[in-house]
Amino acid sequence: MEKKINFAMNLLAQMTIRTIAKRSGADPLEVIADFMESDTAKILYDKETGLWENGPDYIANEYEQEKALKAS
């Protein structure tokens, strides 16, 4: 089961990065580092939080909220 959860987390990270890039118009390669260093990514990869059970749109929204809070 652990391998399936890790696979899901990795797939969701990729899908979320694509979603963020599409929304922002940024190159996905530019989004990767920023997303992977974010608190949202850390929470995504913590299986206890259950964030990995959500879809990429939800995770992208969480990331965008995190960025907005840090910018203010």
Identify the residue ranges that each predicted region occupies.
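C-terminal alpha-helical interaction appendages
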Residues: 1-72
